[in-house]
Each structure stands twice: as structure tokens, then as C-alpha cells.
């Protein structure tokens, strides 16, 4: 069957030429600086977002499968004949292999005026499972990152509480702790795809996304210790200690549910780029509410309507009005392999893999299409399938060499189904920046090149 999505892989698998790291074309920076300056400028004025069309890069030729007489098998390599490196090299902290040095989080040229207020994108196309290595976790800073002295860091809890308190890091880390796996996604993930395909690879279309195990104390525990009025106090304000004065309103319902005041990430202390020594973890909610360098929690009876809730992180509607406090990251998925800027070198079997997530619960099903959405088959969900965490999916695909369009469509535990881009635009228009959870399409050409397209 042509381009068959199946459950039984054939014996011989096709090969994929990986997307070259940093594969934005050489002439993109000048284009991007102009287009994205307009994009960001109009965004601040609640205008339309500009996009830059680019061509997917093509990497160098791949190595052919080994055959009879392969010297890699017949000639004994150096690592099989002598002593290797001693223990505790590289300063006592493990590093990736030198052969993987190109797998990096990367900036997008011209996205912002200064790198301290910018984004680095996670290389989703190069990752396995659901946990993002801490060193590849995407970054979003509003005024750069800091390496804060934990002995001098304090967390204040005040407002509508009986006993306002100031906690040191030692105070917090002596309290009962929990560890939970959750995804974090910037509300602007996929922002440049609202009007047309704008960037070539999944690193840039969906790379403001990561998933980690976070460790800390429940916010509800701190509120209880301080005697918070959780009836009249319907909201909490989270305030960060960096120069951007990031402040976000969080509903008390969320605060009492699964919000964590975290110091740990993936089994170690938070990295400075991720808010060391303390950050808020608000599962299912856009990343801006996961306030880094957390220094204050205030309980109040109404939202604070801060600058990052009235000017930024709002949804512009087609009639010119905007929606506020639309913080939940809706059900979404993306195929990471095969994906944009990769190249299929052979006909035959491929494992189509990707990620799905929802801010409202767990992923229940992911369907995959190889013909642009005309026919769908259910993918395998790889465990664990957790609430408000990434879920890895896989499905077998036989490519016959003809053009194909790969798509994934997720459904979460509430029954919500990920929409097509035209369905989303019918409600939201094309002038939005945030909360684009549309189905992503990857076109596979006859020559095997994979590119970013939109299907209506």
C-alpha cells in the first residue's frame, strides 16, 4: 500500500538524513531582523505578526549501511586496545560526547533586539523519550539570567495571610517535598506559524517546549503555614527577583492544586537559566507564569493586571478585542521525526515519532496521517502517560517514494481534539501571537526532503 501507516514494520528500514544543526539559511538574519522587528513591533501594538518564508536546508550525504568487509568491523579500533579516560574528568561533572556537540539549543536570528530578552529553542528533533536534558531545556528571559547566591535568596509570603513569613532556602528545603514530571511551554511557541509557514525545522516551530521532573514544596503547604485566607483570597501574585520584575496572577484554585515552589530539576538543583535557586511550577499553564528567581507570593482578592497580563501574553481577536488570562496550554502534538529539514534517503520503513501534551490533563490518543489528513491511524503511546506532561508516540510507516504529508492530531482526557490551522483561524484570526496549537504538517517530497507546510 502506498505510504502505508501500519503496525508491522518490514525487515529493512529507511535511512534519515538529520536536519543540520542551526539550519537557518545564511541569508535569513537580514530578512529575519527586518521581518521580525515588524512582527514584534506590531505585536506590541496588537497588530499582525510578520513571518519569514525560508527553504529547508539540505545536509551532506549520509554514510551507506555497512556491507561485507566493512573495516569498522574488521579493524580493531583504538578504544578496543587500550586504556580509556580516567574517572572524574572534565571537572567532575559529566558532559555529552564530542560527537554530539552540534545538538544545542539555538537562537533564531533577528527575533529580538538584545539577547538578554530572547529565546533559545530546544532541539526536539534530536531528543528521545519525554525528559528534556537540563542543558537543552529551552530558555526565555526578559532581562537575562542570573546565578543567584542561594544563601542570600529569600521568599516572602504576604497579603491576605494571618502570619506573613520570609523563608530562606534552608527553610524551604526542610519542608515536605514532592517530585513531579511536567511540560513547560512558552505561550508564544509556534507564534510565527499563524499566517504562513515561517521556519524550516521543528526546533524553531515548536522548540519553546521542554519537560522535566521538578522537585519542591507544594505552594499549598506554604499558604497553610502562613494562614492564607483561601476563601476571600481568590488569587496569588508570583513575583520574580530579576530586573524584569516579572509578576503573574495565579488563581487560588490552581495554587491549592498542583503548583510547586521548586528548587530541583531532573534530580539536581535548578540551572541558573531555569531560575536557580527557586522557581514556580504551574503545571499546564504557559511558561511565563512559571516565575523564575521567585521571591514573593502575595494573596489577594482580585487579579493584579500587571504589565505582562495586560500588554503581553494576551490573545488578539479578529474584531480587535483581546482575551486576557488565557493561560492554559491546550492539547497539542508534533511529529519530530521525520520533520522539517530532514531528508529520507530510502524508500521503506520509518518509525514516525513525536510528542503530545495538554495543559488540561493527560493525552488519551494520537492519530497520524501520511496523506494530509484524509486518512488517520492511531499511534502507540509510550509510557508513562502523565497529566500535564509530554507523551511520546510512535507509529510505523512505509514510504513508497511518492509525495506525502505527515500530520499528528492529539486528543486529551477532556475529549478536546487538536484543531487544524483553518479551524483555529476561524476563531482567532491571523493576528495572534500566543497559544497556537494547530496541527503541524510536514511535506515529504519525492526526493525525500521534508519541509514545513500548512494544510487547510
Predicted features and spans:
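A ubiquitous, low-specificity "background" feature that marks scattered single residues
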Residues: 27-29, 33, 44, 148, ...
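N-terminal secretory signal peptides
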Residues: 1-38, 60-62
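General helical structural elements
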Residues: 19-22, 37-41, 46, 102, ...
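Structured, non-membrane catalytic/scaffold regions adjacent to prosthetic-group chemistry
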Residues: 64-456
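N-terminal export signals
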Residues: 32, 38-63
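Generic alpha-helix initiation/capping and coil-helix boundary signal
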Residues: 25-28, 41, 49, 401
Amino acid at each position: 500500500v502506498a505510504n502505508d501507516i501500519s503496525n508491522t514494520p518490514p525487515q529493512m528500514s529507511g535511512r534519515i538524513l538529520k536536519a543540520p544543526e542551526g539550519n537557518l539559511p545564511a541569508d535569513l538574519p537580514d530578512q529575519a531582523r527586518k521581518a521580525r522587528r515588524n512582527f514584534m513591533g506590531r505585536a506590541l501594538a496588537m497588530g499582525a505578526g510578520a513571518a519569514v518564508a525560508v527553504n529547508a536546508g539540505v545536509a551532506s550525504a549520509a554514510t551507506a549501511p555497512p556491507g561485507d568487509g566493512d573495516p569498522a568491523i574488521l579493524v580493531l579500533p583504538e578504544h578496543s586496545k587500550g586504556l580509556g579516560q580516567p574517572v572524574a574528568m572534565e571537572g567532575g561533572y559529566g558532559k555529552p560526547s564530542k560527537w554530539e556537540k552540534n545538538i544545542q539549543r539555538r537562537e533564531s536570528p533577528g527575533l529580538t533586539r538584545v539577547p538578554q530578552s530572547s529565546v533559545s529553542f530546544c532541539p526536539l528533533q534530536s531528543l528521545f523519550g519525554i525528559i528534556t536534558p537540563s542543558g537543552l531545556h529551552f530558555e526565555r528571559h526578559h532581562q537575562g539570567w542570573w546565578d543567584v547566591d542561594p544563601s542570600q535568596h529569600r521568599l516572602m509570603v504576604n497579603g491576605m495571610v494571618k502570619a506573613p513569613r520570609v523563608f530562606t532556602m534552608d527553610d524551604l528545603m526542610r519542608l515536605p517535598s514532592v517530585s513531579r514530571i511536567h511540560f513547560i511551554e512558552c505561550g508564544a511557541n509556534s507564534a510565527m506559524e499563524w499566517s504562513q509557514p515561517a521556519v524550516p525545522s521543528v526546533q524553531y516551530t515548536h522548540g519553546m517546549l521542554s519537560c522535566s521532573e521538578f522537585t519542591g514544596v507544594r505552594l499549598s503547604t506554604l499558604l497553610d503555614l502562613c494562614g492564607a485566607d483561601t476563601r476571600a483570597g481568590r488569587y496569588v501574585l508570583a513575583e520574580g527577583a530579576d530586573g524584569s520584575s516579572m509578576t503573574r496572577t495565579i488563581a487560588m484554585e490552581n495554587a491549592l492544586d498542583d503548583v510547586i515552589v521548586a528548587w530541583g530539576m531532573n534530580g539536581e538543583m535548578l540551572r541558573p537559566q531555569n531560575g536557580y535557586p527557586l522557581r514556580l511550577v504551574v503545571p499546564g499553564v504557559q511558561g511565563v507564569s512559571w516565575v523564575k528567581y521567585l521571591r514573593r507570593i502575595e494573596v489577594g482578592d482580585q487579579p493584579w493586571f500587571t504589565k505582562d497580563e495586560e500588554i503581553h501574553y494576551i490573545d488578539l481577536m479578529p474584531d480587535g478585542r483581546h482575551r486576557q488570562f488565557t493561560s492554559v496550554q491546550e492539547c497539542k502534538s508534533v511529529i519530530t521525526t521525520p520533520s522539517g529539514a530532514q531528508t529520507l534517503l530510502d524508500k521503506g520503513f520509518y518509525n514516525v515519532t513525536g510528542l503530545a501534551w495538554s495543559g488540561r490533563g493527560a493525552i488519551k490518543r494520537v492519530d497520524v496521517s501520511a496523506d494530509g489528513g484524509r486518512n488517520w491511524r492511531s499511534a502507540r503511546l509510550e509510557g508513562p502517560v502523565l497529566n500535564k506532561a509530554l507523551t511520546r508516540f510512535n507509529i510505523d510507516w512505509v514510504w513508497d517514494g511518492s509525495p506525502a504529508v505527515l500530520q499528528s492530531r492529539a486528543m486529551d482526557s477532556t475529549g478536546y481534539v487538536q484543531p487544524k490551522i483553518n479551524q483555529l483561524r476561524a476563531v482567532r484570526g491571523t493576528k495572534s501571537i500566543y497559544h497556537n496549537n494547530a496541527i503541524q504538517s510536514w511535506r515529504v517530497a519525492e526526493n525525500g526532503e521534508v519541509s514545513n507546510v500548512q494544510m487547510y
